[in-house]
Design a protein with these regions (language model features):
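Glycine-rich segments within core transmembrane alpha-helices of 12-TM secondary carriers
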Residues: 21-25, 105-130
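Central cavity-lining transmembrane alpha-helices of secondary-active solute carriers
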Residues: 12-36
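Symmetry-related core transmembrane helices of the 12-TM Major Facilitator Superfamily/SLC fold
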Residues: 49-56, 137-155
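Juxtamembrane intracellular "pre-TM" segments in multi-pass secondary transporters
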Residues: 158-178
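Cytoplasmic helix-loop-helix junction between adjacent transmembrane helices
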Residues: 80-115
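A membrane-interface helix-boundary motif in multi-pass transporters
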Residues: 40-47, 128-145
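C-terminal ends and interior cores of transmembrane alpha-helices
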Residues: 47-67
Length: 178
């Protein structure tokens, strides 16, 4: 954003609005716990949907010339962040369902560490691409990397029950069978 001449005020506005979906995670969790398509798995459904939606939300930014912080940029990045927040909730829930209690602390540490390293690497890569090639190209690379990340949940299989427990029918959950 600095490379296009955005002011500190513009960048602050963009960041403050695009972070709003993260404050709404508390309301999204019960929705993710309640609705699913059994064909994809209880959590994997939300991970797949949110990853596709993340890519679709930023894809216009590959074609739109970004010359300033404006309503379109803020809207698309806020929408993108909403789906990132949904994916974050679903991935955490998948980990909680897939791990035994004695594994959760270590897994949580690895997840946080991986997220921190990923953000650092991602920021360095994005900054290099944005400055070296342009913002549109940066969003194209982002979409390509998200497409690669999409392969993990596509080819993984989710447990139909909580790890360490027998398979149970989940009460209070709407499951759509195909």
């Amino acid at each position: 954003l600095v490379s296009i001449g955005a002011s500190v005020k513009d960048i602050s506005l963009l960041l403050s609005i695009t972070m709003v979906p993260w404050t709404l995670k508390v309301f999204l969790g019960p929705i993710i716990d309640s609705f699913t398509l059994s064909r994809f798995g209880r959590r994997r459904f939300w991970i797949l949907i949110s990853q596709v939606a993340m890519m679709l939300a930023v894809s216009p930014l590959v074609f739109i010339e970004v010359t300033q912080v404006n309503f379109i940029l803020i809207s698309l990045l806020t929408l993108h962040n909403a789906f990132v927040a949904i994916s974050d909730i679903a991935i955490d829930a998948l980990a909680a369902d897939s791990l035994r209690k004695d594994q959760m602390a270590n897994a949580n540490g690895f997840m946080w560490g991986s997220k921190t390293l990923g953000r650092g690497f991602g920021m360095a890569l994005a900054t290099s691409i944005f400055y070296g090639y342009g913002i549109n190209e940066g969003f194209l690379v982002l979409i390509l990397l998200m497409s690669l990340a999409f392969l993990f949940p596509i080819f993984s299989k989710e447990l139909s029950h909580k790890a360490g427990q027998q398979e149970l029918s989940h009460k209070n959950r709407l499951t759509l069978n195909e």
